[in-house]
Amino acid sequence: MAIDDNKQKALAAALGQIEKQFGKGSIMRLGEDRTMDVETISTGSLSLDIALGAGGLPMGRIVEIYGPESSGKTTLTLQVIAAAQRKGKTCAFIDAEHALDPVYAKKLGVDIDNLLCSQPDTGEQALEICDALARSGAVDVIIVDSVAALTPKAEIEGEIGDSHMGLAARMMSQAMRKLAGNLKNSGTLLIFINQIRMKIGVMFGNPETTTGGNALKFYASVRLDIRRIGAIKEGDEVVGSETRVKVVKNKVAAPFKQAEFQIMYGEGINIFGELVDLGVKHKLIEKAGAWYSYNGDKIGQGKANAGNFLKENSAIANEIDAKLREMLLGNQDDKPDFTPAAHEVDEGSEAKENF
């Protein structure tokens, strides 16, 4: 609808005044020629990238990953760090639980020599560090592990048994208001790992809730619910777990999609097994009986052998991944590189059961 000349002049003057006072880009028309596509970072799982719709986790946003104990929350975030570092991005890990294992992180492909790490004393200190890193504009991905471990200063200085109603929720609410704008301006991805608690006296509906109040639920652009749904065995030995992730909230694509993948102890997400499954599903890989073939050449008998073939032939793995992303996401901007990096540990490293 056309605006009359007087209103147009008044609007132009107001916009000019706002840009003069607050800087260029502080206000604009939504349809202006400015990219609305959100840059993303791969989660390390192709099926989860597809479930997210945008091809990964969105930069400049807040993401919450929650689930029961030993469900793979920290493993998933370490895979995000590894994927970001392969793209030359700077990452930071705020270890509020004081439980980060650098040996395990290295096994997942994290360049620990270039990973910033902080073990804050209080929740306020952890969130101030996040804010300072975001405002610097030099850090691309920040992980906070976990919201439940962000203990308010008043609680630490008090005695065990003292009542501190709503302190953590108030601290998180204040931090979210401050962080959201700074993250958007700097394009920094902030991932909060969270734990599950049970609501007392819930007779109907889901009794589960997450810690830290409701502010994080509102400010998060993406919320992921991660669950361990089964064990992977070699003989009688458990070597990994079947994992399901549900996209509970998604502001950049359609929500409520699910992804299932394997997490192998000491190795992380079984990306090559995912490539085999998705390749067969979308007819890039042929399956005849137990044999798998790609472009007419047999690549292995059984899923495990086919996955090992792709692991040893990174060029073919990259090619299949690129085709799947083009087919299912319509882009290849954030495709990972499966060529082993120099900082990754040797194949013979002892596997470690660490979630």
UniProtKB/Swiss-Prot annotation:
Keywords: ATP-binding, Cytoplasm, DNA damage, DNA recombination, DNA repair, DNA-binding, Nucleotide-binding, SOS response
One MF annotation (Gene Ontology) recorded for this entry: ATP-dependent DNA damage sensor activity
A Pfam family assignment: RecA_C
Ranges for region Disordered: 331-355
Domain of life: Bacteria
GO biological process: DNA recombination; DNA repair; SOS response
Binding site for ATP: G67, P68, E69, S70, S71, G72, K73, T74
Gene Ontology terms: cellular component: cytosol
Cellular location(s): Cytoplasm
Record's keyword annotation contains ATP-binding: yes
CDD domains: RecA
Function: Can catalyze the hydrolysis of ATP in the presence of single-stranded DNA, the ATP-dependent uptake of single-stranded DNA by duplex DNA, and the ATP-dependent hybridization of homologous single-stranded DNAs. It interacts with LexA causing its activation and leading to its autocatalytic cleavage.
Protein family: Belongs to the RecA family.
Protein name: Protein RecA
